[in-house]
Regions:
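Charged, long alpha-helical assembly modules
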Residues: 136-196
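A non-transmembrane, solvent-exposed segment enriched in polar/low-complexity residues
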Residues: 1-128
C-alpha cells in the first residue's frame, strides 16, 4: 500500500503531523487538535489535495481524478469553493476550444479576437470575484489566509496585484497580522520599492 501524509506549514517548512498506509483503497487517521489548520495530503512526496484539519469526521474521496474532502464545516466550504473554481476552469478551457472552432469555421481573426477577448475577460472577472468573495467571507478562519497564501504562492516572487490589494485593503487586522501574510506583504512592498 501507498503511504499518505498530512503536512502542515510550520516555521517556513512542511511538517508531517500524521500518516497512514492505504490498504484496499482505504485509510484512517485519528488525533487531537487545538485549532483548525490548513494542511496538505501527500501521497509519498506529491501533494494531492488541500484540506482543513479540524474537529470532526473528515471524509476524503479520491476517484477518477476527482478529489473531494467533506464532513466538516470548513472542508465543506473549501470544496464548494474548489468545485466553483473547477467549473470556471472548465469554462476557460471551453473558450480556448471555441477559439479553434471559430477559426475553423472561417470567422475573421478580428471577430475571433473580439469574441475570445470578451469571454476571457468575463471569466477572469468571475474568477477574481469568486476568490475575493471566498477570502473575504473567510477572513476570520483558516480558509481566508490559506487561500490567500495559495494565491500568493502562484507568483514567481512576492508581488501585489489589484485583486490582492483589494483583499488586503478590506481585511481585518487579524488577517493582516497573520505571520505568513504579514511576511508576504512586506516582501511584496520591498520588491515594489526596488522596482520604483
Amino acid at each position: 500500500g501507498k503511504m499518505l501524509f498530512v503536512k502542515v506549514p510550520q516555521a517556513g517548512e512542511l511538517v508531517n503531523v500524521d500518516s497512514a498506509e492505504v490498504v484496499h483503497g482505504l485509510f484512517q487517521m485519528e488525533g487531537e487538535i487545538d485549532s483548525a489548520m490548513i494542511a496538505s495530503l501527500y501521497m509519498d512526496e506529491q501533494s494531492i489535495l488541500p484540506l482543513v484539519v479540524e474537529k470532526g469526521n473528515i471524509q476524503i474521496q479520491i476517484d477518477n481524478g476527482r478529489l473531494t474532502v467533506s464532513g466538516t464545516p470548513l472542508n465543506d466550504k473549501l470544496y464548494d469553493f474548489v468545485a466553483q473554481k473547477n467549473s470556471l476552469d472548465d469554462r476557460a478551457y471551453e473558450v480556448e476550444r471555441l477559439e479553434s472552432r471559430m477559426i475553423m469555421d472561417g470567422k475573421s481573426m478580428e471577430e475571433v479576437e473580439t469574441e475570445i477577448t470578451r469571454e476571457r475577460e468575463k471569466l477572469s472577472k468571475e474568477m477574481d470575484d469568486l476568490v475575493k468573495t471566498f477570502i473575504q467571507t473567510n477572513y476570520e478562519n483558516v480558509l481566508g489566509p490559506g487561500i490567500f497564501l495559495m494565491l500568493c504562492n502562484g507568483f514567481p516572487y512576492p508581488l501585489m496585484t489589484p485583486l490582492l490589494e483589494e483583499i488586503v485593503d478590506n481585511a481585518p487586522d487579524t488577517f493582516k497580522n497573520h505571520d505568513l501574510i504579514k511576511e508576504y506583504l512586506e516582501a511584496a512592498r520591498a520588491n515594489l520599492e526596488r522596482l520604483n
